Amino acid sequence: MRVLYVTSEAYPFCKTGGLADVAGSLPPALARSGVEAAVILPLYDRIGEQWRRQMTFRRYIYVDLGWRHEYCGLFSLERQGVTWYFVDNEKYFRRGRLYGEFDDGERFAFFSHAVIDLLPSLDWMPDVLHCNDWQTALVPIYLKDVATRWPEVRGIRTVFTIHNIEYQGRYGADSVDQLFGLDRGWYDDGTLRMDGDVNLMKGSMLMADAVTTVSPTYAAQLHDPRYAEGLESVVDAIGWKMHGVVNGIDTVGYDPASDPALPAHYTPEDMGGKAVCKSSLQGALGLHQEPDTPLIAMVTRLVGHKGLDLVQQAMDGIMATGCQFVVLGTGDGQYEDFFRWKAGQYPGRLSAQILYAEDLSRRIYAAADLFLMPSRSEPCGLSQMIAMRYGAVPIVRSTGGLADTVKSCQVGQSDGTGYLFGDYDAGAMLSVIGQATGLYRGDRAGFDTVRQRGMTEDFSWTRSADSYRHIYENL
């Protein structure tokens, strides 16, 4: 089984979000499971010199996209049992950033077409093209388009993964031929048409041989108009080929027993180092040195769907539990200003770190007793799994991947790893925070059992890779 994983970003080469973590971890896990895996992504100028020095130039071609005739170079390197291919074009990928350009549609149409045109230049012809989000949504469509005149690619199957359905790749109707170089029939027959515009994600969902999302609960929720962003009828139509596969995390990189960012190390069997991490963070962030005060943390983008309006409503109630609170992240100004204001109201008890620093995030995970993630929507989420790995008990809303990865430890549950609430309501969130801090104060041994149970959960990519391999083999 040969799989070419098509992505617009991949860690450690370039990253803006969770897609990069998935693209950097899943293909090596597939390789370990026996799949011949390769990855192809754009050669952005942000990819560092340390990686460029390892690359080999393979060849160049020209890609025809509508009336455009563009240079396309191909580079590669080997890493973790995977060949990583890089598509070079300075016009499109020398921008200083990955996304947010006026011509993103053209840039990623070029990349998607280049993937198809470069297939003969790879070490092998793939059995499966695995595409991700709107940036690569044209790949299954271009493949179908060229298959009528290119018999060698007719046996290739496609998988399309929806990481976040909010971003669909919507463009004007005239972009079909002018921008994407496709026959108008792709729009006229409804494949790419939605509400009078082109919708790339819709087209890929219809044309791919299988569609996956990043958790079973999120896959089920996409039938609901509240979550599907207008695509619920498409989800209903393709339900027979849709799968939910929970993401994993890099359990080697995220390991409190060896993480170089931590002032002390610890394991589920020997938790002494976690107290050192907590004390160290309290000192660094100006919090009172109180080892027995529960420390609640958030490491998040400060945007609305992360549930920050609930936190705003409940903040004083949270602090009334007698806890300490740390938030790390950047985003919407209203939330940044809110947390700065609250930090001033609660000196020594609330720290607002309005920035993002990887090492600091790891220190926060290691120091925290509880990790708050009250998302309005969360396709999968990685933070709750990282938190459990570092012994921070998650408090999450039961939605998307949060519902699939956190087991309730409310009364009567013997295998719980965290606290869940269902209604999107500040009172419901505050109630479970009270339960969690109450257990911490009233039954430390019981709390530590929950903490250690979460640390031993298997969040490796092995299970995810096995699920994807099963999907590939049954296309």
Label each residue range with its predicted role.
Residues 1-475:
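Catalytic cores of nucleotide-sugar-dependent glycosyltransferases that transfer UDP/GDP/TDP-activated
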